[in-house]
Amino acid sequence: MLDINYIRQNPEEVATMLHDRQLQGDEPKLQRLLFIDTERRTLVQKTDELKALRNTRSKEIAELKKSGSGSADQLIADMQAVGEEIAGLDSRLSALNMEMEEILLALPNRLDPSVPVGRTAEDNLVFGEPVHFPHPLEFDVKNHLELGKALGILDFERGAKVTGAGFPVYVGKGARLERALINFMLDRHTEEHGYTEVFPPFLVNRDSLRGTGQWPKFADQVYHMEEDELYAIPTAEVPVTNLHRDEMLSAEALPISYAAYSACFRREAGSYGKDTRGFLRVHQFNKVEMVKFTRPEESYAALETIRGHAEAILCALEIPYRVLLLCSGDISANAAKCYDIEVWSPAERKYLEASSCSNFEDYQARRANIRFKADGKSKPEFVHTLNGSGLATSRLMVSIIEHYQTLEGGIRVPEVLVPYTGFSQISPSC
């Protein structure tokens, strides 16, 4: 959520941000917000003046009654009228405050100056050079779905029977490989990258979704348990960030770094017509998430650190990838700056998103009321929050299966995963 003071002082800058994000349709909301803010401040001033008058007259009434020097009836009648006027103003202020909060929750985050201006994903910039690893595939490459079925390690048909399309089942060594991938990433982040592991709930309340920005803008993308008013998490970012909702953090404790595994659930409403084969688009997948809480002046260095930690996982797995700096028209509404990390699919002949690393600045912290005090004399400040996928296993599994396939129709296991799997290859006879 943006600071209303920032919006009031920089309305043209906010309007430019909406234009750069291709959200010109939100400009009437901005104009309405500015109108409400002006009216609200006028009403607050008038209410304060009337309350001050009521306090003064109340003292005069008390003095008249005490001294008996005159009648207080007219003053009492006047103050009753003032009280009714104050009640009306308070009611109007309450309505304005609710509408203001509704608009503030709907407006996107500011953009860091380093974010390139663009309309669509086609305008994203390749950051640095793509990273390659030697995986000679001198034969006709099979896709992950074909190989997974042939080896008996993936079962999308039974997943569809049990739940519906987009809910995969990992079988045998496929399940073992998935678990190995999760454990390897958690170990690398906690033992080498300095994160504290947490294992969060997979269901959250609406306040948690509001805190991280999924509510109300992306309400149609989450699974909702209406009877209990709980929601299946789209990412561990939601419960982990909200661990510190409504808290005053110790400045000495910052930065705080968490790594969390969770299953992730996404309705993917509006994805009809997109490629939905295999792991390319699923409703449930596994992911290890990195979340950081930092001082404002340290957040952009922390973003580069998170990106580096995600890249380190791919380098250890020897999976080819590239990094994109997202443009203004493709970046999420909550992020001020975002990198996407994409892995190469030999069968699809294209890059697939496996990680997003974002700096939200104080956008989430304002919504979730997460603050810190630099010292005992300072005013509380909002922390900056960041997160990064470290990483999503579904797209990693695509790349591993396709890059490590053998001429015989099997799959070699990446060397760093062998201690976790207990086997180095998945053969057609498994």
Curated annotation (Swiss-Prot):
Residues that coordinate or bind L-serine? T235, A236, E237, E289, S389
GO terms for MF: ATP binding; serine-tRNA ligase activity
Residue positions annotated to bind ATP are R266, R267, E268, V282, E353, A354, S355, S356
Task: Give the reaction(s) catalysed.
Answer: tRNA(Ser) + L-serine + ATP = L-seryl-tRNA(Ser) + AMP + diphosphate + H(+); tRNA(Sec) + L-serine + ATP = L-seryl-tRNA(Sec) + AMP + diphosphate + H(+)
Q: What class of enzyme is it?
A: ligase
One GO CC term, this protein:
cytoplasm
Q: Does the keyword Disulfide bond apply?
A: no
Q: Where in the cell is it found?
A: Cytoplasm
Q: How does it assemble?
A: Homodimer. The tRNA molecule binds across the dimer.
Any domain commentary?
Answer: Consists of two distinct domains, a catalytic core and a N-terminal extension that is involved in tRNA binding.
The record describes the protein's role as: Catalyzes the attachment of serine to tRNA(Ser). Is also able to aminoacylate tRNA(Sec) with serine, to form the misacylated tRNA L-seryl-tRNA(Sec), which will be further converted into selenocysteinyl-tRNA(Sec).
Annotated protein name in UniProt? Serine--tRNA ligase
